[in-house]
């Protein structure tokens, strides 16, 4: 290619018959040639860079930079699975009851029932009438879009009941509470035929309405899929929960202590050990104030020796020490307001100075949006408890069971399930000086070897008394490899 210099080409300049101008003009002509050569090279390289910028070069550069940037989910999400093609037999409307984790398990069960019966499921309504009086809707706690999309290949889920089926338009819903601990035959033989006469059925209760055992492997694994994949907290809750975990982990390993010594638990169970007479009377009045709490007259000490009461904060101190936890152990209290306030936590703080709660780790403005929303607060505790190095519940309630199962699913993370019946016996023997401290500590450790550390094990099955069986969500063995 010739490069033009004025009216001459480079080839003309190189001809042997060409008479050069006076010597003083030669350096200027050569400078012009080299100038245009350099410009041409720059132009070519610029074009090449533009061509490859968004492919190899750019990709390599951004990959290199990303190593030093904050962890961000850069992997694209897989496309949503295609919806399952089925003719719906009707619409299932569900009202959940109880606290966050009781409702969580119930949602998993109701998705499974909808799949079994080929129903369209309306996003479940959360409990707003119980003791906690939390006004949160499903989408305030869980990522509703993810819930619907992630399960679309199994169940058709809609956000709300179509208007034509609402009371406002004169439609009368058929309401029923399913029988507790029911198997697939109950739903196929007793519930499904009702949809031939009614387009919509409303389940007014949802707690423990599906059996722990005896279901097909596909149904059991669907329960797990909803629990571990379909039910994801909102980005706001996930972000703050992750921040709590990050703060705790930066300070070292930590124990999540689910100290279930809260007013609702004590009033419901009738457990008043360690309370004053005035506090015991306050708890009794509260129990009578809630008509759906069936038991009213409860003898606290009888309940306690049967292992049916949560440990008091003072009892928890002795048990933690006996299990070998040192004074410098970082302990996160996964609980709401402790009954009796700061005075009941005094011994715990004295024995383990590194006691923390979410209110101590976060700025008040960060928690302000969660105030008066106990289920959203419980979601934060759930995230921290699942992530903890060791999880210890002082009462084996719904949160303890669901967190235990989640930790098993994540690789059998250490979970100490306290044998409260045995512990009460040992605590009383130690407190009345029958057992020395060393004897007490050895006995406590011996009582928690084997099945009580979250190791792999099979669920205990008692078909005639399903309430006494091991809970499916505490040990979803069908889903753990």
UniProtKB/Swiss-Prot annotation:
Entry-listed glycosylation sites: 85, 118, 372, 432
Pathway, per record: Glycan metabolism; pectin biosynthesis
GO biological process: cell wall organization; fucose metabolic process; pectin biosynthetic process
One Pfam family cited in the UniProt record for this chain: O-FucT
GO molecular function, one term: glycosyltransferase activity
Residue ranges crossing the lipid bilayer per the database entry: 33-55
Membrane topology: Single-pass type II membrane protein
Class of the enzyme per the UniProt entry, highest EC level: transferase
Principal localisation: Golgi
Keyword terms: Carbohydrate metabolism, Cell wall biogenesis/degradation, Fucose metabolism, Glycoprotein, Glycosyltransferase, Golgi apparatus, Membrane, Signal-anchor, Transferase, Transmembrane, Transmembrane helix
Residues that coordinate or bind substrate: 258-260
Cellular component terms (Gene Ontology): chloroplast; Golgi membrane
EC number: 2.4.1.351
UniProt-annotated location(s): Golgi apparatus membrane
UniProt record similarity statement: Belongs to the glycosyltransferase GT106 family.
Function: Glycosyltransferase involved in the formation of rhamnogalacturonan I (RG-I) oligosaccharides in the seed coat mucilage, which is a specialized cell wall with abundant RG-I. Transfers the rhamnose residue from UDP-beta-L-rhamnose to RG-I oligosaccharides.
Protein name: Rhamnogalacturonan I rhamnosyltransferase 4
Organism (species): Arabidopsis thaliana
Name of the gene this protein is made from: RRT3
